Amino acid sequence: MAENQTQSKEGYIIDYISGTQVKASPEELEATQVFSKILVEDYGYPKTHIQTRPQFHVKVRPSDTKKEYPVDIAVFSDTEKTDDSIYLIVECKKKNRKDGRTQLGNYLTLSKANLGVWFNGEERFYLLKQNTDDGRVLFKEIPNIPKFGERLEDIGAIKRGDLIVTHNLKSTFKAIRNYLAANAIGATRDEVLAQQLINLIFCKIYDEKYTDKKNIVRFRVGLNETCAEVRSRIDKLFSDVKTKYKEVFTKEDIITLDDNSVAYIVGELQNYCLIDAERDVLADAFETFIDHALKGGQGQFFTPRNVVKMMVEILDPDDDDMVIDPACGSGGFIIESLRYIWNKIVNRYKEMGWSDMEILEEKIDVANKCIRGIDKDYFLSKIAKAYMAIMGDGKGGVFCEDSLERPENWSSKTQTKIHFGDFSVVLTNPPFGSKIPVTGEDKLKQYELAHKWKNKKGTNDWEKMKLAEKEAPQILFIERCYQLLKFGGRMAIVLPDGVFGNNQLGYIRRFIMKRFRLVAVIDIPLETFMPNTGTKTSILIVQKLKSEDIPSDYPVFMCVAGTCGHDRRGNIKEEDDIAEISSQFKQWAVDNNFSFKNYGR
C-alpha cells in the first residue's frame, strides 16, 4: 500500500485490498486500512477473498431487493464473493461500542455471514451469529476470529509453533486499553492497568519460551471456555513466572484484573509471538497506557525498534564487550544488544561443534556478565529486569538508580557491578528537555558540562566559568557516558538537534571533539518519535580515545534518513530509510578503511 500512496491524488490513498484510490478519511486511515492489513498479514486471509472497493452491500430489511447497507470489509469463503459465500463482516465506523454492536448485528442478521468484527481504530470486538431452533438470532462475543483455514473450534487451540510474528501491536494495545478503561472492575488508573498488562505480557513471553513448538500454549482462550477457566490457567502461569524469577517478582505481584478482562486480553494476544516481534512489545504497551503528560513530564519517549537495531548493528557488540544503557527505560537497547550478541554466539560456536547445552550456558553467561542497564524509574527498571530475566537470565545487570548521581551514592550492589571506565559499548536515548533540569550543587559539580562556558572571541575555544544552577539531563548524560566508557569504547546516543547546531552549545561540541573520534552523525526524521514527541533528533556515534590518538583529519559518516517506517500518527508505512543505514555504514567503513578495532576495544 505504502509504495503506491505517493501516486494517489491529494486527499486520497491507495486501498490496501483493491488497489483503487479512496478518500483519506479518518475511518479509512485508522480503521479500514489497518484492519484490512491485519486480516491479510496476521490472520492469513488472501486478498482475493476480501472485498473493500467497490463495497459489498447487504439488505436493510428482509424485503429489501437493492441491498442498501455498504459493508466496510467483507470476507468470503471463496473468490466468487457472492451472497452465499460471505463469511465475515468487518464494520469500521466511528461509533461507540454499543452502537457498533447494534449495527454489526443488523449486518449479520440480514446476511449469510456468521462472524463479525467491529473495529473503530481504538476498540474492537468479535461476534458469532447463532440461529436458534425457534427462529431467533442471537449474538455471542467470542475471544477472536479463526485464521484463514481454521474452524471456529480451533480458536484458542494454538500450538507454540503456529504463533505468528506481527509487525505492529499498537492497535491491539489501544483496543485493550480502551476495553479496560470502560469495563475493568477495580483498577481504572492507566498506571495500574499498565502494570497489570505487563504482568500478563510476561506470562505470555514465559509461555512462549517454555512451551515446545508441537504443544498447545497455556496463554489462550477457547471458543467455549468460561472466563473463570481462562483466569485460573493464567493465575497458574503467573505463579510459575514468579517462582522462577523470585529476584524480580514478589508475592505482592498479583493479577488484580477481573476474569472478563483477563480473558479479553488473552484473546487479543493469543495468536501472536511476542518474543520475536519486530517492535518492542513492552515499550508499545507501556506507551499506550501511560499518557503523554506523564511520559513527557519525565522526558520518557521510547526508542523505535528500527532505530535501536540500527544503533546496535553499527556498534556491533560481541561477547567480549561490556554493554550499558544508563537510561535503559524498559530495556530496548540492552535486550536488542543481547539478541545481537546471542546470534553471533550461536553462529560461531555451532561451527565449532558445540552442543546446544554448551551454547545455552554461554548465552546465559554473556547475559549476566556483559549487559548492564540503569533507570531511575522503579516501574521501568522492573520491566527491564523482568524482560532480561525471562529472555536470558540477565536480571542481575539492571539497576534502579539515578545514573547522574555520584556513584558513591548508588546502592552497594550497583557499585559492585558498574564502574567508570569498564564499558566498551554505550547505547542510550537519555531523557531530554529544559522542563526536567538536573539541580543540586553536589550532583552538578561532578560534570564539566554543568558549568557555564564562555566562547573565546574569534576562536573555537571555550573558557569554563562558574557552576550552573541547573542543566538539561541530555547534556550531563554525554559526560556520564564518557566516564562509563573505557578508552577505545564506542557510543551511540540519541540527542536533540540543538546539541549539533546551536551556537550557544558550541562548548558541548568542543567537549566531544576533544575526547572522542567523531564516527557518524545520523539525521533522523521528525516523525521518528511521533506521535509521542515532535522533538527533532539525530544520532551521534563516537569512539572514546586519548587525545594523542585522535587523528587531526579523518572521514565522518554523515547520513540523512527521509523516512522512518511510520507517519506522524504512528501508522506503519513501508518506506523506512533507517532500516538501511547500518548496511550503508558498514560499506562506508570498508571504503574508508575504518574499524573501531583499529583503536583497541
Please provide the spans of the model-predicted regions.
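A short, conserved, highly charged catalytic patch centered on acidic carboxylates
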Residues: M1-L115, E122-R160
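Short amphipathic alpha-helical segments and their helix-coil junctions
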Residues: S8-T20, N168-R189, I265-G267
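Structural motif
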Residues: K23-L29, A184-I198, T256, I275-E278, ...
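Short, hydrophobic/amphipathic alpha-helical patches that form generic packing surfaces
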Residues: Q33-I38, Q195-E208, M388-I390, E479
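Class I SAM-dependent transferase core
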Residues: A182, V281-N306, V312-I314
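Long recognition/docking surfaces used for binding and targeting
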Residues: T188, I198-D291
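Conserved S-adenosyl-L-methionine
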Residues: Q300-T428, G433-V438, L495-G498, N503, ...
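A conserved structural/catalytic subdomain of Rossmann-like adenosyl-cofactor enzymes
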Residues: S412-K413, K417-R601
